[in-house]
Design a protein with these regions (language model features):
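Negatively charged
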Residues: 2-115
Length: 115
């Protein structure tokens, strides 16, 4: 699923509730540079086998709300720049399965994580 919606700059809203992601291992750049995307519902994504989420939402500068409540990141080894270029006003819904997120995931994020 890497690069699946990469560069879809006119995409404003996306609901992928019914996507079967059980066997997916790579989600790198999946939504990269979807600059008009404001809302993204991934609440049923199975990420148990995913190892790469690098730049997954990078450049989604209009994104205001994202539902990651089903995400399990236990096997993810690369989250670099996952939210790079995202608005600092983004609302993220996550649960306890989201682990091991390092600061690199927010590299070049529009907000200062050190404050």
């Amino acid at each position: 699923m890497s690069d699946m919606f990469n560069g879809s700059s006119s995409l404003k809203e996306l609901n992928l509730n019914n996507f079967n992601t059980n066997n997916v291992t790579n989600m790198e750049c999946m939504f990269y540079e979807c600059t008009s995307l404001k809302e993204l519902n991934l609440c049923n994504f199975n990420t148990n086998n995913v190892t790469n989420m690098r730049n997954m939402f990078s450049g989604c500068s209009s994104l205001k709300e994202i539902n990651l409540s089903s995400f399990n990141t236990n096997n993810v080894t690369d989250m670099n720049k996952m939210f790079s270029g995202c608005s600092d006003e983004i609302k993220m819904m996550v649960k306890s399965q989201v682990k091991n997120i390092k600061q690199e995931a927010f590299e070049d994020y529009d907000d200062d994580l050190n404050n």
